[in-house]
């Protein structure tokens, strides 16, 4: 299908005090996707340590969602949800296999079918990279330090940046474009004793700082986890905790290098944005920055992700939309935005109708409309990995901003947290008689939401 330029991308819904008209060709799309980047790893989110000036500026020019979450906290599954707009129960990807959803129903596939020049750069964690489905594809394996064709070393973040800039500089000028830049950072190099290997340019950062331990990075907090985690040193989140955080010295070294990797990604994001501005297309480009999952930094005695706790499921989400009136830029929005909302948001910005298979929603009305729509107040979380339950147990949850009901299906165990009074999930209320009536309602709603996403 040939692409037909739109006279304007502003729909009637957006002709309000929060929107400005963007006339001309179809909107370009750039998705900046970080790895294992939890929601508070931004200085604009209140983090007192990490330096992210470029992403802070992006937030000032757009909208930052303060309660963005993933529906499954693991890279391959979450990325499948981001591309397809579907929960794991529907797209069927439970590990790192190729997409089961038809490619024509993903956002890159639909955009290419409608005349977009599409590119993917960096991490691809869903089977063999489908190079033929993109006009420009640079996906590769590896973590942190790699080698160029001539054998000289290059950091993977620099390679991600270089490939993204090549896409932008070689793209055809007569087509709208969509670039997904999937950074490898801040993922650890599992198996390497150092875990995090940042760029040389960032090694001087954070040297003289002492990074505070999280409130729940304690043996007591671990003891409150279910016994199949707390008393199981074969549990992968405990294994990786020992890799990274089991001594104060190790914690400081790991966290400083994690933040150095984050600052390196921030710098590369800034250079991509600068290239868009240099080419005169920034103000006709929807830019989205987000992460594939959250991350435990020792909270509850854990490392990595997988589970439905706040540190694991919450991710950064910044949307810079050129339709947003300048006076409205820099706002935050506490709506429950999800990774499944990214694909419908992209397609709507391109003037396309999301396929009925997509379960997410267009985020734009939340920040463009003077009277934002009624939005979800809860969602179903799921993670059912294809592995031994003693290594990574399956977990499900009903998540609201003020309460969370967790179910561990492998062990038929429940947990209940009142997030309004216990935001760090320290006090499990599942056995509290005062919660009995509330629990009946939560169990019922949990079952309804689980069925609805299938």
Regions inferred by a protein language model and the residue ranges of each:
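Bacterial N-terminal signal peptides
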Residues: 4-16
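Conserved, charge-rich beta-strand/loop surface module that forms ligand/interface-binding patches
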Residues: 420
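Formylglycine-dependent sulfatase
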Residues: 2, 19-408, 413-414, 423-444, ...
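Extracellular C-type lectin-like domains
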Residues: 417
């Amino acid at each position: 299908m040939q692409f037909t330029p739109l006279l304007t991308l502003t729909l009637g819904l957006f002709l309000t005090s929060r929107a400005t008209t963007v006339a001309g060709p179809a909107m370009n799309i750039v998705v900046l996707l970080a790895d294992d980047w939890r929601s508070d790893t931004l200085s604009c989110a209140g983090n007192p340590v990490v330096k992210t000036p470029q992403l802070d500026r992006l937030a000032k020019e757009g909208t930052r969602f303060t309660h963005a979450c993933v529906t499954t906290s693991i890279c391959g599954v979450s990325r499948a949800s981001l591309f397809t707009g579907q929960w794991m129960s529907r797209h069927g990807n439970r590990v790192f296999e190729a997409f089961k959803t038809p490619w024509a129903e993903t956002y890159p596939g639909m955009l290419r079918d409608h005349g977009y020049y599409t590119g993917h750069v960096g991490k691809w964690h869903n089977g063999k990279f489908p190079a033929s489905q993109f006009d420009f594809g640079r996906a590769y394996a590896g973590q942190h330090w790699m080698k160029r064709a001539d054998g000289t070393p290059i950091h993977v973040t620099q390679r991600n940046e270089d490939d993204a800039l090549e896409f932008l500089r070689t793209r055809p000028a007569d087509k709208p474009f969509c670039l997904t830049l999937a950074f490898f950072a801040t993922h650890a190099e599992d198996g390497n004793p150092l875990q995090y290997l940042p760029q040389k340019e960032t090694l001087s950062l954070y040297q003289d700082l002492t990074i505070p331990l999280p409130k729940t990075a304690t043996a007591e907090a671990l003891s409150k986890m279910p016994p199949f985690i707390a008393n199981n040193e074969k549990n992968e989140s405990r294994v990786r905790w020992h890799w990274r955080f089991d001594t104060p010295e190790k914690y400081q070294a790991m966290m400083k290098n994690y933040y150095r990797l984050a600052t390196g990604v921030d710098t590369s994001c800034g250079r991509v944005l600068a290239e868009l501005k240099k080419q005169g297309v920034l103000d006709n480009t929807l830019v989205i920055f987000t992460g594939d999952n959250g991350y435990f930094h020792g909270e509850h005695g854990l490392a990595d992700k997988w589970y439905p706790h706040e540190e694991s499921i919450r991710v950064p989400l910044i949307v810079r939309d050129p339709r947003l009136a300048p006076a409205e830029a820099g706002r935050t929005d506490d709506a429950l935005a999800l990774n499944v909302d990214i694909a419908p948001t992209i397609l709507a910005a391109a003037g396309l109708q999301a396929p009925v298979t997509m379960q997410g929603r267009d985020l734009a009305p939340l920040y463009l409309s003077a009277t934002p729509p009624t939005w979800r107040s809860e969602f179903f979380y799921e993670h059912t990995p294809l592995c031994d339950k003693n290594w990574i147990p399956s977990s499900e949850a009903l998540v609201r901003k003020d309460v969370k009901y967790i179910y561990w299906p492998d062990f038929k165990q429940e947990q209940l947290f009142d997030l309004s009074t216990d935001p760090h999930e320290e006090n499990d209320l599942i056995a509290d008689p005062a919660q009995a009536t509330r629990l009946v309602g939560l169990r019922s709603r949990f079952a309804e939401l689980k069925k609805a996403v299938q």
